[in-house]
Amino acid sequence: MLVGVAGNSNTWGIKMHRIVIVGGGAGGLELATQLGRKLGRSGRAKVTLVDARMTHLWKPLLHEVASGALDAAESELNYLAQASWNHFQFQLGRMTGLDQKSRKIELAPLYDEEGNVIAPRRSISYDTLVISVGSGTNDFGTPGAADHCLFLDDPDAAIAFQKRLLSEYMGAQARGKSETLEVAIVGAGATGVELAAELRDAARQFSAYGLDKISPENLKITLIEAGPRVLPALPERVSLPVAERLVHEGVRVMCGSAVTLVDEEGLQLANGIKVAARLKVWAAGIRAPVFLASLGNLKTNRINQLEVSETLQTTQDPNIFAFGDCAACPNGHSGTNVPPRAQAAHQQAHFLALAIARRIEGRPLPSFTYRDYGSLVSLSREGAVGTLMGNLMGSFKVEGWLARMFYISLYRMHQRSLFGTRRVVARMLADALGRSTEPRLKLH
């Protein structure tokens, strides 16, 4: 399934440089859009984006989809439409192999909902390959985790959780008696904390809309963290007040508690405590897709991230770049890697849009420099909390409505890179009108 001008030559008969981007997450889609505008429109390159889904949803929104605070269908962006608007091509498929010698990637067959093959195994040729397939949750091999926990790695998983949550409330209402629902969240990083806060707000909304047989007090949320505190990536002056706020909101916070076993009834902790839970979410740790570890001679680390240099080229093949969560990129001379954050992928996409244009022109590539602008964590409609980095003031804490505005602006920045300022303003107005005529929680 392709959109755009077919073939490898432009209207002047000059062979175009073939750029293939695998993965349409925040970074991959931003890069395809920028390269399409910069190189695809002028016929200097043929830009192709490959993804296993037809639509894009900004991953930091998944906890809102899971709670029902956001309808995924209203926030998804169709890759075909974005490709048509921005002079690149889209091909639906899942990457399964790589032939470095002939410069081709292999895609798995496509199937319809009945299991019929609608497209056979295919290959796509490239001159420059960019891999941006993101990461998934790392269950660290914990027995039972894969069978009994949900992982908020994609919109389908978030929607599945939302449906199960709604079913619990609808079932209790139909039975007509007061019930208790236990939810356990493993991992108190940003995703775990944000989901806990959203679920606490969702409990109040369910009751307001008449689903009151599971009262807000009877939605028992347990947040489990193996480390000593919540939000370990943020300073203690930020994370400790967040933990206090969660406890005040009725969330049970258990730090220093490693999960050793998950079963249908709940989770077993290393300290011998058993946490009962009907709904279980694993949000601890990340790892890149397993297939990356078997791609040609490319080197990966222990969590399957492709090892890249400061130019974001893989260490074994200069024709292949990788960025975002799936890449282990050195962070200057710090001895650490660039953190797996949305802001890093955004910066790397902008860097690669310029670097790949230089590569086509035969010019040397610059080195990527990551700039940490701070971290923000949403606490649902109660606001947000986090740190911002300034050149003069260093790191400083923000919270409440101001932090919430900064948090929302991150999403608007992502939208602006995809649509431009005027269309983002139009979307903001449409969102505001929608909030005045729709329920605050998805109830279907």
List the predicted regions and their residue ranges.
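FAD-site-proximal beta/loop scaffold in flavoenzymes
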Residues: H148-G176, E265-Q268, K274-Q347, L354
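Short glycine-enriched, charge-decorated loop/helix-capping segments at active-site entrances
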Residues: L62-G68, A146-L150, V238, G296-K299, ...
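C-terminal, flexible cofactor-proximal segment of oxidoreductases
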Residues: M16, A353-H444
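Rossmann-like dinucleotide-binding core of oxidoreductases
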Residues: E179-L234, P241, R252-M254, V338-I356, ...
